[in-house]
Structures are given as C-alpha cells and as structure tokens.
UniProtKB/Swiss-Prot annotation:
Further comment: Present with 12000 molecules/cell in log phase SD medium.
Assembly description: Component of the glycine decarboxylase complex (GDC), which is composed of four proteins: P, T, L and H.
Cross-referenced Gene3D superfamilies: Aspartate Aminotransferase, domain 1, Type I PLP-dependent aspartate aminotransferase-like (Major domain)
Stated name of the protein: Glycine dehydrogenase (decarboxylating), mitochondrial
Induction, as annotated: By glycine.
SUPFAM superfamilies reported in the protein's UniProt record: PLP-dependent transferases
Keywords: Mitochondrion, Oxidoreductase, Pyridoxal phosphate, Transit peptide
Domain of life assignment: Eukaryota
Subcellular location, record wording: Mitochondrion
Catalysed reactions listed for this entry: N(6)-[(R)-lipoyl]-L-lysyl-[glycine-cleavage complex H protein] + glycine + H(+) = N(6)-[(R)-S(8)-aminomethyldihydrolipoyl]-L-lysyl-[glycine-cleavage complex H protein] + CO2
Protein species of origin: Saccharomyces cerevisiae (strain ATCC 204508 / S288c)
C-alpha cells in the first residue's frame, strides 16, 4: 500500500510540473486515475500470470482458445524456473526491482475489450462483423493512384499469407536472406526496365513520400541553394499535400504550373533558382504530355543543372515510352496495381529510380550483386553508408523501414505474368477505356471529354445541367459504382485490370449513352497511339519468362523462401526490433475483401467498418500511452518521428515561437532520430551519455540552458537505446519543459512499458509507436510498418489532415499540418493486426507482454553474463537488470582478431539470425528475445552463444580451430565441394553441427560470407538480361 501511495504522489508531481502543457481537464482526469491506483494497480504477480495463461476449466462458459497462452512463450512453470535462476520467486517482485519506483505506474488499462481479452474465434467473429460494415462490393473507378487489382492466388497463399515471408527481418544478414534479396532485385529490375533508368531502390513508403524524396534530392543536389521547386498542376492532390509538408522546413517555395501549357512551363523552369520539377505521367486527369513537351521540360531544367522528376504508373509504362527517353533524372510512383490490394490506402510499395550519377544519393535500400568468400555470385544490401543509421543527421533520407513485402508481391506478380502478360493487361485496360472515351466523344453524348489522350483515366465535363453530385449518386444507387468528383460539374474515372465489358456497359448507362452495343463491339487493344508507344523490349531477364504456370511459380516462391531465415525457423533476437509473434489470427483479416477492397477515397458512409476499428484502436492506444490524441497517418517509424516533430514545430509556430529550432538528441539515439530532426528543419544538438549508459542530465541541462531561446524539443528513447530504465527520465523531461521545449519520447522500446508505465504518465508531450514492434505487425523483410503518433491535448489541433477526403475520426483543422502520407490513415490494411493483438490480450494480459519480454531478456543475460561482458549492467553499474534487451560487449577481443561480425556470422551456422550488430555501440551485439519465445528457444540461443565463446577462446589462444569464426557461415556447398578442409584446423562436423540440436533441425546459409567491399565497388542492382548472361557464359 505504501508503494502505491508513493506512486500516486509521484504521478501528481509529474502532472503539476507540466501544467503549462496539459489542460486543466486533463489534470483532473489524471488525478482521478492517480487516486484509482491506490486500490486498482495492474496485477502482474505470478499467480495472475497463471490465471491469464491457463484456460478457465471450471467455468463451462469460458472459451478454451484463449490467446495469451499462444502469444506468451514461457509457461507458468517455466517462469518459475527462470525467476529462480535470477533469485526471485514472483514476477511482481522481479518487476519492482527492475523498473525504478518513480517510473513504475501500473495504471490499469481501459481497453475496449473484455478484461481477459477475446479468444481467437471470438476475435475472428468480431472482426468479420466490423469488416462487413465496409462497402467492399462496390465497383471503384475512383483511381487517383489507387486501383482494383487481381492478386494471383498462388502469390497470395504462398507469399503474402506465408509466415516464411512476412516474419523475416530486413536482409542485413545476406547469407540467410538470399530469397528475399532475389525477389527485391526482381522488383528493382522491373522498375529500372519500365522507367528506363539504371538504378532503382527496393521500395519506399508511398507515392507521396517518394515525391517528397525526389524534391529534397533535387534540393540537395543544388547544395540547398535553389529554393524553388515546380510541380505540375495535374499532379495527384495527395502528392501535392505531402510535398508542401516536406517543403516547409527547408523554406522551399513550391510553384504550381500547367505543364500542358508548355511555353509558360518552360519559361518558369528556366529560372536558375528552380532545383527541379515533378510531372505526373500520365497526369491525374488521364492526359499524357506529348513527347516533345516532355523533352522541352527536361532541356529547360538541364540547362542549369536541375533535375526532372516524373511520377508515373508502372502498368502504363508497359506500353508508354519510358520517362528516361525524355531525359528524366528521377522516376517514382506506386507499384500498387501490380497485384497489391487497395487496402484503404496501404501498404503499397513505392518505387524510385535515378540516373547513374545519383546512385549514391538515392533514398532507401538498394539490393546489389556481389560475391561470397568462395567467389560465388550472391546478393546483399549495397551502399549502406548512405543510410540514416550511419550518416545520422547527414543522411540522404530518414527512411528505414519501407515496403519490402509489398515490393515482393509486386515483383512476383511481374514474374508470374511476364512481359507479354503485363502488356496484355495494359492493352485491355486501354481498350476498355477507349470504348468509353469514344462513346463520350460521340455527338449524341451531352458530356465533354476533357483529356484527349489517355491510358486508363478519363475526366469528363458534365452537360445537360447535371451536377457531379447527381451523377455520383446515380452511379452508386443504380449500378453500385463509385466515381470521383473533380468539382461540382466535372468527374473523373479510372479503369483497371478488374474492369469487365459489363462494367463499361454500366458506365455507358450512367452517362445515358444509347446504343451501347455499337461501342462495346470495338477493340482498341492494338491501337495505342504510336507517338507514345514504347518500342523497346521489356523485362528481358529469364526470370520473367520461366514461371508462368502455377506449378513453376509455386516452386519458385518456395525456392526463394527456403533460402531465408524467418520466425518460422528460429528466434530473431534483434535488439531494438522486437521480433515477436505475428499470430495467424491477427494476420487472417488482411486478405479479406471487406478490408482489402476498399479505396481510400470512398465516401465515409461506405467505410463504417474501418471507422469503428480505427476509432477503437485509437482509444486503446491512447489508454496504453497515457495520451489524449492520436494520428494513424504515419506509415513507418521514421515517418512517425518526422510527423511528431512537425507537429511540435506547428504548435510552437502557433504560439509565435518560430525561432525555436534546436532539437536535443542523446548520442546513443538511433540514427533515424537525428535524420528525422534534420528533415523537420531542426538543428541537432547532441547530448552526452555517462559511462554507465545513462543520459548525462548535467549536460542536458547545460545544453537546454545554452539554447533556451531556440529549444524546440528533445528526442529520448525510453527505455534507453541501451535497454535501460533510467530513473532520471522525469527529471530530464522537467528540464526541457522548464526551458520551453517539448518532449518527444521515441516509442521504439514501448514493448517494455505497456501496462507498467507510459510516455504520457512520465510527462512527455508526444511519442510514436512502432506497430511493427510492440503491436505485432510483421516486419515483412523490411516493411510494411505503422507508426501512429500519440500526443497531449495541446498538440491535437496540429495533427496531420488530408486534402482529398475528410478524416473519418474528425482530425483536421486550420492548425493541422499537411499530409505526411498519401492515404489518410497510412497503412490502414495492417491496422486490424494491432487491433486484434490488443483486443485478444485484453486489459489483464497485455501488461504481461512487457513483463515476460523483460523476464526473457534478463534470464538470457543471467545465463550469458559468466561468459561475456554485459554492457552497462554489471558489477561496476548501479543497474542490475536490463529492460527488454541487453548488450553483449565483444570489443576486448578485437585486438586478438575477433570482430562482432564474426560472432554474428557464426550464429547462422547454429540456425540463428544475429542480434543487432554494432548498434548502439560498435563492437557489440544487442539481444532482444521478446515475450513470444519459450524457455527451450531461449536456452538454445544461450547454448549457441556459450559454444561460440569457446570458439572465441580458441581463436584468441591461437588455436587453428578458432578460424571457424573467420570462415563462418558455412554453406552446404562449402561443406561438400571445398577441397581445403584438411588445412582449415576444424572439421566439417564442427562447422555444421556444433551442438546436438542442429542434427534434428538445421537451417543452412545459402552462401558463404559476402564481400561487402566488392559489392559497393562494383555496383550492379538489376537482373542481367538474357544477352548479358549469354555473353558471360561465352
């Protein structure tokens, strides 16, 4: 009871210290919660864990398919053993020792779910009821960057719905990622072929953010001297909005011109202060700029070394001349229509391609071709020194997670259809669009076709006094069709691969066109205008010609996934990544048509299911974080950071404090923090950490005081990036508040807080959440992600809006920042995953995700501390526990020739993905097991690490066996075909089967250790053509 009273008083103190930032109503509400803590603190005892874990067999009404025992790895008896190993008898006592008393709040959660959570079948029934409230059977011809697609079932079942694909991590360990790397290389090849540019990345977040990256790349190439950027009037509106958001922090002036008025456009582009121009091709109204106009735009920009960027459509580019033909420097867009569902706006893989001289400036990850230790061709992520985890605030972009899973879907769609199949789809779309266009241009039709060129989109000025509202109403009520209202008397529509002749017949009826049969009998599939038609052969690599039968495609996908290590194989103990279970029940709804077939610009009354789900999820996340408001629009962690900082800046500007532009960031922070701050127009000032890993509060106070007039914010990860619960966090927050700054608490490590404490309880102003970490969205091999930002009440008016549709949850006003993503709710299709996870764990179960995550981490640390040095948690430290992750220090062995990367590679021979390598401290490994791993798996990993320590000792002692580390990993080919085993100093058995469990279940690295230097020095990031392969063979 005394402990609870102290906690309540500390909560009150926190609120009083933040009165300038929290409304009086919020303070009263918080006080009532603090009083509640005296009698209703969250129960995290071992007895409660047994109740949560075990089904209730006494009550016949209670379901047996409860979720917590499926999600949480250790059984109650395992928990007892683990606690005993560490000297504890109860989970509650363990947590009270681990989390500082001023941090441990244990405020009861108020989730909109049964206290013990839904069981699995209840969850599916509940979600189906919600999903059926969406109008998913309506035929959407809205377009504007989102289209109906047909996802081949062989790809849906064997890739999108396969845990071997969606539970893997970003392929930073290439020896166990060759399958995904090949699929991503296919994606890059598709993009490079269709755009005509030599270098493409492995995806970005969406078309709008890709456009923002193009603008900033153009700006940076000008050395930030050219402050004007030109955009075509006929750009998608959501892209314009994102561009305005990205431009503001750099004082870039966006100039909108009508590029179809080529003389006027060229005059504007000749201004030497213009860094670049972005054109939509085909345009949002469906029109296509003539070749000579595109060339004039390019020439005008190149005359003063500025860049032409083109936002394009990959499906259209199977027929259209590639933008590179006209001199484009950058081509970007969305690959969504290559089989990826609309999903109410995402996730979809954006693409980004550049000319050769920009290959080291391109944002995002690039897959390149290299070779391994044995000289075998292999794939890896290339040019990593560009990325934010290395360059920090000097990085080309803050992009981290992208859309790898969806890029793999899109590339597989292209592999399955091949070049002829893709062009047949495109010709059919064009033919059906032409039927409708010619009917509207007929003399008997009262309406006027605005665009005289097209691929799939038509814009129509309505006649006979008909309003857009009337026509849209008629289309929906009589034919179950959605169209797009451009203005009160103009509509547009876009056809896609799902469109049939019956659909076109209904559209003719919508426009009151008689004698439809005479138009429907026409075939325009071979009538694509010659002036626009590409003449080169596309997708020449053999991979796009070999797998067109379902059997061949099934085997190809299986062959790729068998080369990759995922959670289906073993634990992925990556620190700061939280590779927890992505349960089957959570994943099932994402391919339901009720969720996947929804266009993001459908009227709000047609998406009531999404509205109900989003509203409830937002309330739950606010309860978990202790905040008042939320935006689900950011679609990656880096995007969430950027959005939170932009919201802070908007709030400060509204108070007349535009001059506040300094962001304090600890030196231990993840590289996305300083990169995001720089993108938000903030000056990064580093704050030191002490030798024990904690934030240097004296340095923080000095820096805050030094920059008191310019201080905008501090970005702090909690628990810290070192995996520590620092007791001084509230003091740090008070320091920043006292000098007028806002506090951004990075939610990357939220998996250690849920139900125990929260950013809001600690006094922060804003945080982002990684839904792909704490809330069970899969990593997908590098995306998708979700990163809502949660804020205190004073920041709610500044949350991002959307320019095309109203936000169904009511956010958006005069103070709102412009969109940060193309879609109003970002990657909306994956939100049911987090929704289901929270609802199934329930108020009582969810805190145990954090409790067991920390139990697993500390158990592993206890087992390993006698064999390795543990950074910051040792006999020299006041901290005796880590949070949910810990750092193994290998730096002492470097002088003897052992690097952390040697241990990382050797773990592959034991069947494990390496922990986080060289971050946050070079020469270390950061380990995070998550709550989903059982005791058997934890012990297996610890046994592997202990065995590797013996190998380290051998190398340090100069014994030949120690070379096993330097040669790791060992592929099956190496073991069978290499002829130098007599001189290696160790046996094949020692290389492949160092521990007994590997004889029962062995995952083989596909290739030997890669040559990173060779890969960067000889950059190849597309599949070679058939001719190139033939030449190599000769």
């Amino acid at each position: 009871m005394l402990r609870t009273r102290v906690t309540a008083l500390l909560c009150r103190a926190t609120v009083r210290s933040s009165t300038n930032y929290v409304s009086l109503a919020r303070t009263r509400s918080f006080h009532s919660q603090s009083i509640l803590l005296k009698t209703a603190a969250t129960d995290i005892t071992s007895t409660q864990y047994s109740r949560i874990f075990n089904p209730d067999l006494k009550n016949i009404d209670r379901p047996l398919d409860t979720f917590a025992r499926r999600h949480l790895g250790p059984s109650p008896s395992d928990v007892k053993k683990m606690l005993k190993t560490m000297g504890y008898s109860d989970l509650n006592a363990f947590i009270e020792e681990l989390v500082p008393p001023n941090i441990l709040k244990r405020r009861p959660l108020k989730l909109e779910a049964p206290s013990k959570g839904f069981c699995e079948q209840e969850m599916l029934q509940h979600l189906e009821k919600i999903a059926n409230k969406n109008h998913y059977k309506v035929k959407n011809f809205i377009g504007k960057g989102y289209y109906g697609t047909i996802l081949p079932p062989v790809i849906q079942r064997n890739l999108l719905e396969s845990p071997e694909w969606y539970t893997s991590y970003t392929p930073y360990q290439p020896e166990i990622s060759q399958g995904r790397l090949e699929a991503l290389l296919n994606f890059q090849t598709v993009v490079s072929d269709l755009t005509g540019l030599p270098v493409a990345n492995a995806s970005l977040l969406d078309e709008g953010t890709a456009a923002g990256e193009a603008m900033l790349l153009s700006f940076n190439i000008s050395r930030k001297k050219k402050l004007k950027y030109v955009i075509d009037k006929k750009l998608h509106q959501q892209t314009k909005s994102v561009l305005h958001t990205r431009a503001k922090p750099f004082n870039i002036e966006i100039i909108e011109v009508d590029c179809s008025d080529i003389k006027k456009a060229v005059d504007v582009l000749k201004n030497p202060d213009v860094s670049g121009c972005l054109v939509q091709y085909p345009a949002t109204d469906g029109s296509i700029l003539p070749p000579d106009s595109m060339k004039q735009l390019s020439d005008a920009l190149h005359s003063h070394k500025s860049l032409l960027s083109v936002a394009s459509d990959l499906m259209a580019l199977t027929l259209l001349k590639p933008p590179a033909h006209y001199g484009a420097d950058i081509v970007l867009g969305s690959s969504q229509r290559f089989g990826v569902p609309m999903g109410y706006g995402g996730p979809h893989a954006a693409f980004f391609a550049v000319i050769d001289k920009l290959n080291r400036k391109i944002p995002g990850r690039i897959v390149g071709i290299s070779k391994d230790r044995l000289g075998k061709t292999a794939l890896r992520l290339a040019l990593q020194t560009r990325e934010q985890h290395i360059k920090r605030d000097k990085a080309t972009s803050n992009i981290c997670t992208a859309q790898a899973l969806l890029a793999n879907v899109a590339s597989s769609y292209c592999v399955y259809h091949g070049p002829k199949g893709l062009q047949n789809i495109s010709r059919r779309i064009f033919s059906l669009t032409s039927i409708l266009a010619n009917a509207i241009e007929n003399d008997s039709c009262p309406h006027e076709l605005i665009n005289k060129t097209w691929f799939d989109t038509l814009t129509i000025k309505l006649g006979n006094g008909i309003s857009s509202e009337q026509l849209l109403d008629k289309a929906l009520k009589e034919f179950n069709i959605n169209l797009f209202a451009v203005d009160t008397t103009t509509i547009s529509l876009a056809l896609d691969e799902t469109t049939t002749k019956a659909d076109v017949e209904n559209l003719l009826k919508v426009f009151d066109i008689e004698n439809s049969s005479q138009f429907l009998s026409e075939d325009y599939s071979n009538s694509f205008p010659r002036e626009f038609q590409r003449t080169d052969e596309i997708l020449r690599n053999e991979v796009f010609h070999m797998h067109h039968s379902e059997t061949a495609m099934l085997r190809y996908l299986h062959r790729l996934q068998s080369r990759d290590l995922s959670l289906a194989n073993s634990m992925i103990p990556l620190g700061s990544c939280t590779m927890k279970l992505n349960s089957t029940v959570e994943m099932m709804p994402i391919t339901w048509p009720q969720f996947s077939n929804i266009h993001p610009f459908q009227p709000s009354n047609q998406v009531q299911g999404y509205k109900e789900l989003i509203t409830s999820l937002e309330k739950d996340l606010c309860s978990i974080t202790g905040f008042d408001g939320i935006s689900l629009q950011p679609n990656s962690g880096a995007q969430g950071e950027y959005t939170g900082l932009r919201v802070i800046r908007s709030y400060l500007e509204s108070k007349g404090e535009n001059h506040r532009n300094v962001c304090l960031i600890p030196v231990s922070a993840h590289g996305t923090n300083p990169a995001s701050a720089a993108m938000a127009g903030l000056k990064v000032v580093p704050v030191n950490c002490l030798q024990d890993g904690s934030l240097d509060l004296v340095d923080l106070k000095n820096k805050a005081e030094q920059h008191s007039k310019e201080l905008a914010a501090v970005m702090i990860t909690y628990p810290s990036t070192y995996g520590l619960f620092e007791p001084g966090i509230q003091h740090a927050i008070d320091i920043v508040h006292s000098f007028g700054g806002q506090v951004y608490l990075d939610g990357a490590n939220m998996n250690a807080q849920v139900g125990l404490t929260s950013p809001g309880d600690l006094g922060a102003d804003v945080c982002h959440l990684n839904l792909h970490k704490t809330f069970s969205i899969p990593h997908g091999g590098g995306g998708p992600a979700g990163a809502p930002i949660c804020v205190k009440s004073h920041l709610i008016p500044h949350l991002p809006k959307h320019d095309v549709v109203d936000m169904i949850t009511g956010i958006g006003g005069s103070k709102s920042i412009d969109s940060v993503s193309s879609a109003p709710y970002g990657n909306a299709l994956v939100l049911p995953i987090s929704y289901a996870y929270i609802k199934m764990m329930g108020n009582e179960g969810l805190p145990f995700s954090s409790v067991i995550a920390m139990l697993n981490s500390n158990y592993m640390m206890t087992r390993l501390k006698d064999h390795y040095k543990i950074l910051f948690v040792n006999e020299m430290s006041t901290l005796k526990h880590c949070a949910h992750e810990f750092i193994v220090d290998l730096r002492e062995y470097k002088a003897k020739g052992v690097e952390a990367i040697d241990v990382a590679k050797r773990l592959q021979d034991y069947g494990f993905h390496a922990p986080t390598l060289a971050f946050p401290v070079p020469g270390t490994l950061m380990i995070e097991p998550t709550e989903s791993e059982n005791l058997e798996e934890l012990d297996r990993f610890c046994d592997a690490m202990i065995s590797i320590k013996e190998e380290i000792n051998a190398l340090v002692a100069g014994q030949p066996k120690g070379q096993i580390l330097k040669n790791a990993p060992h592929s099956l080919e190496d073991l069978i075909t290499s002829s130098n085993w007599d001189t290696r100093g160790y046996t094949r058995e020692e290389a492949a089967y160092p521990l007994p469990f590997l004889r029962y279940n062995k995952f083989w690295p596909t290739v030997a250790r890669l040559d990173d230097t060779y890969g960067d020095m000889n950059l190849i990031c597309t599949c070679p053509s058939v001719e190139e392969i033939a030449n190599e063979t000769e």
